[in-house]
From Swiss-Prot:
Keyword match Methyltransferase: no
InterPro entries: KH_dom, KH_dom-like_a/b, KH_dom_type_2, KH_sf_prok-type, Ribosomal_S3_C_sf, Ribosomal_uS3_bac-typ, Ribosomal_uS3_C, Ribosomal_uS3_CS
This protein's name: Small ribosomal subunit protein uS3
Matching CDD domains: KH-II_30S_S3
Gene3D superfamilies: 3.30.300.20, Ribosomal protein S3, C-terminal domain
Gene of this entry: rpsC
Length: 267
């Protein structure tokens, strides 16, 4: 059920990698709890920074934290003051030396998490949800490496009494194909009517042998424009038994009567 499961977890070890990379024996539960606390710390108060993802690597006495953000200037701060504050809080939380790396996301309009955050911000600012979804789809499809996108909003859309879900899709989004490079993002918009969940799936081509294969771009123009082949005609079925019209004597006699006048006209 590729349509239901988280696309990152569905493809772990195939096309996607873990966001926490370390090994532990007896301290496994403590490290997982610590990773959740690190991500929660970076999420609070950094909404304007546009954080796409946080990757964590551990050694025996050091923790490496990579922050992928669309606005690195907000995370770094003036003369690195904000980065120093974040590093100090992380060292206090983990009790170890922290190596903080701030990496810029080159194409934020093709990053699913950042697209979801952008739609959620518009919903919080009372923008119509359909308009916000269409605008996000149009800006994402302008990127050359995006082959398809799906945006879904769930909750009390437009202040309705009953919550519902609506989605828009453009291009291909093959969620059950394991070799497909699917980027997934989830964010919640806080509105006066309650929370609205925003989910975004972005298809960026197939990954074959560790390399991304852009199926639409690599296919020749003749293959894309080729018309679909028509299926061969099947014999007619009659009755509930599924027998064909020519498998019984009555059926053969009826078809012979129909075909005879056509032969006379040709003669």
């Amino acid at each position: 059920m590729g349509q239901k499961i988280n696309p990152h977890g569905f493809r772990l070890g195939i096309t996607t990698d873990w966001k926490s990379r370390w090994y532990a024996d007896k301290q496994y539960a403590d490290y997982v709890k610590e990773d959740v606390a690190i991500r929660k710390l970076l999420a609070t108060g950094m909404e304007r920074a546009g954080i796409s993802k946080v990757e964590i690597e551990r050694t025996r006495d050091r923790v490496r934290v990579d922050i992928h953000t669309a606005r690195p200037g907000i995370v770094i701060g003036r003369r690195g003051a904000e980065a120093d504050r974040i590093r100090a809080e992380l060292e206090k939380l983990t009790g170890k030396q922290v190596q903080l790396n701030i990496l810029e996301v080159k194409n934020p309009e093709s990053d699913a998490q950042l697209v979801a955050q952008g739609v959620a911000e518009q919903l919080s600012n009372r923008v119509a949800f359909r308009r916000a979804m269409r605008k996000a789809i149009q800006s994402a499809m302008r990127s050359p490496n995006v082959k398809g996108i799906r945006v879904q909003c769930s909750g009390r859309l437009g202040g309705a009494e009953m919550s519902r879900s609506e989605f828009y899709r453009e291009g291909r989004v093959p969620l059950h194909t394991l070799r497909a490079d699917i980027d997934y993002g989830l964010y919640e918009a806080k509105t006066t009517f309650g929370r609205i969940g925003v989910k975004v799936w972005i298809y960026k081509g197939d990954i074959v042998g560790g390399k991304r294969e852009l199926t639409a771009a690599s296919a020749p123009a003749g293959d894309r424009d080729r018309p679909r082949r028509e299926r061969p005609s099947r014999p007619r079925r009659s009755g509930s038994t599924g027998t064909t019209a020519t498998s019984t004597e009555a059926g053969r006699a009826a078809t012979a009567v129909v075909e005879a006048p056509a032969e006379n006209q040709e003669g």
